[in-house]
């Protein structure tokens, strides 16, 4: 039996999936959202298993392009070319437009197009993650900060992934030199869940910016099982070395 999973994640770009496909897609998506190391392999398996599905291809192309490996752009391009336009819905078409610009290397257009998707659906955590991280690569400005302030108003602690929004908004505040607010939001996010590495990253950024070597959540940080995570963990380790350096 087919069912939509968009009501769970507020997505309207996900294909109708059976129970197994729905579980596998959510697993792959969560792997990316939480910086797990197996997101690419899980998305690849989904595409290989059912090439007719569009959402797994959107996820896989995004993961390939997020690697910033120019040698792999052709792989994303081939996936894009394999999609039949008459089989997609309106929001999928918008995502594919984002990916087309991304493949072309036009990150400014990518960010603007993703922002338009978010305006239509401010609870699409996948689009928000893509907006947040691609914005970093083109340079953060007041628009980045303003977008996060507008977004967080549309979320509540009853929403799935609310702590992720807190972590990203914390980073936006930190980059806007408001370290007190950045700390409060990162701490609130980690009080909800210790699973988001980006919330840890935001907290570490605050400490780095203030040259503060006393991480108040050190015990919880030391409990992170790094075996689950991909390259992001190395970036956090780099921040951790700054602690040792300043000590």
Question: Where do the protein language model's features map onto the residues?
Answer:
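Alpha-helical repeat scaffolds
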Residues: 9, 38-47, 72-86, 107-119, ...
């Amino acid at each position: 039996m087919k069912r939509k999973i968009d009501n769970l994640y507020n997505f309207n770009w996900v294909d109708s999936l059976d129970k197994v496909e729905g579980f596998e897609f959510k697993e792959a998506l969560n792997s990316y959202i939480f910086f797990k190391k197996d997101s690419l392999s899980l998305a690849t398996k989904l595409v290989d298993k059912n090439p007719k599905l569009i959402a797994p291809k959107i996820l896989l192309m995004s993961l390939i392009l997020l690697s910033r490996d120019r040698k792999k752009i052709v792989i994303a391009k081939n996936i894009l070319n394999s999609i039949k336009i008459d089989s997609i819905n309106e929001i999928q078409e918008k995502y594919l437009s984002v990916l087309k610009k991304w493949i072309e290397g036009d990150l400014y257009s990518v960010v603007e197009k993703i922002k338009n998707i978010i305006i239509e659906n401010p609870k699409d955590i996948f689009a928000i993650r893509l907006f947040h991280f691609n914005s970093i690569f083109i340079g953060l400005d007041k628009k980045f900060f303003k977008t996060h302030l507008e977004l967080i108003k549309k979320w509540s602690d009853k929403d799935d992934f609310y702590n992720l929004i807190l972590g990203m908004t914390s980073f936006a505040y930190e980059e806007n030199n408001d370290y007190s607010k950045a700390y409060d939001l990162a701490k609130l996010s980690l009080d909800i869940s210790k699973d988001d590495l980006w919330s840890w990253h935001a907290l570490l950024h605050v400490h780095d910016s203030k040259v503060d070597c006393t991480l108040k959540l050190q015990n919880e940080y030391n409990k992170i099982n790094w075996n689950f995570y991909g390259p992001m963990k190395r970036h956090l380790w780099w921040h951790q070395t700054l602690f040792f350096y300043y000590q």
